[in-house]
Amino acid sequence: MDHIELISSPLDITTLYTLLGDPGCGASSVFVGTTRDSFEGKKVLSLEYEAYEPMAIKEMKTICTDLRAKWPDLKHIVIYHRLGSVPVGEASVVIATSAPHRLSALESVSLAVDQLKTRVPIWKKELYEGDDPAQWKENKESLRPKHSQVTSNRFNFATCKIEKQNENISDKLVQIRVHDDELSKRVECFVRRKRMEINMLNVRDFTQNQSLPHVLNNEEAEVSCARTQGAVIKQEQSNCHLKVRRVNNKSGPQQMHLRPNYAQELNKLMGSSESSCDPSGQVQNDLANNRLRTIESYMGLSANNQSLLSRLKQVENRILLLESTSPEYNHFTNNLKQPDSEEPSPKRLKRKIYCAEELNNLLKSFKDETGS
């Protein structure tokens, strides 16, 4: 059994020792911590203990659990700690265990003392005789980080040197010419206005009753609240509760189906350039060079006595430029088919939509067929 307590009265060691009694135990180990009369040449009058009691009790119970996990044969565990003023010679802490064998009792008490000083949030202040001021004692065995370690990791702003700013700054580089107060005021106004816009949109999108007069008139009622009256309202022709708008581009190569005569009109405009690109008069011995000259003349490029690879690179750059800047380049890249040679588009199959009752009937018929 575990006996744990924080008390303000003196500790009675004899009474606590009776808590260890058990017929099956052959050994008991007791540790008693008392107040000594001196510390580093100073005469100590008393010690004062303070604790964060809920957390201290929790940690003491955890210590008991750890002891029983390591020594399962422990019968009783006693951890009593005194709070308040403890004069010289009186006990401040009692830790005791009982077990069938002495080794478990001795080792468990030693570990419990170390864990108590390391984990339990109990603080001690020493009161000295004379003019020496009282001093809170730092527990060097505590697992918690020391104040010096925390402060040492902080950033030292003194190491950052601020260079003198150049006063000869051009006015063109300064975008805001107001004081800090005016700038803060503008930022606050901007945030307030955006907050009002968001609140109004929330009322429009999430209000529970769209027919309310204050909603239709963009006015805020005294008893309305978007958080409490909000509801998910599915918009028409949309899979979500927010409004979705579809934009159709009425011009460009991707919208040619909206202009049936677009290809014919573009062919008429390009007819003159196509007829002028006749490579019959530019026959050369090198077939690759001949074909490249045809492409260059068609695209309006000049060879300028460059190498074959350089001319190919020039043609590629020209194609990339046309693709990025001219929508009508779709006439060159896409092989448009005549209306007579267009293949019929495959018909979309309409799938029948079954209701829940029809599905149940189908499943029932399948079960009957398999069962028969």
Swiss-Prot record:
Residues that hold substrate according to the record: H101, R102, K117, K124, K125, E126
Subunit structure: Heterotetramer; composed of 2 small (Mocs2A) and 2 large (Mocs2B) subunits.
GO terms classed as biological process: chromatin remodeling; Mo-molybdopterin cofactor biosynthetic process
Keyword terms, alphabetized: Cytoplasm, Molybdenum cofactor biosynthesis, Transferase
Name of the top EC class for this enzyme: transferase
Matches recorded under HAMAP family: MOC2B
Enzyme Commission code(s) on record: 2.8.1.12
InterPro entries with a match to the protein in the record: MoaE_sf, MOCS2B_euk, Mopterin_biosynth_MoaE
Encoding gene per record: Mocs2B
More details: This protein is produced by a bicistronic gene which also produces the small subunit (Mocs2A).
Pfam families assigned: MoaE
Subcellular localization(s) per the UniProt record: Cytoplasm
Catalytic activity: 2 [molybdopterin-synthase sulfur-carrier protein]-C-terminal-Gly-aminoethanethioate + cyclic pyranopterin phosphate + H2O = molybdopterin + 2 [molybdopterin-synthase sulfur-carrier protein]-C-terminal Gly-Gly + 2 H(+)
Pathway: Cofactor biosynthesis; molybdopterin biosynthesis
Predominant cellular place of this UniProt entry's protein: cytoplasm
Task of the protein: Catalytic subunit of the molybdopterin synthase complex, a complex that catalyzes the conversion of precursor Z into molybdopterin. Acts by mediating the incorporation of 2 sulfur atoms from thiocarboxylated Mocs2A into precursor Z to generate a dithiolene group.
Cellular component aspect of the GO annotation: ATAC complex; cytosol; molybdopterin synthase complex; polytene chromosome
Protein name as it appears in the record: Molybdopterin synthase catalytic subunit
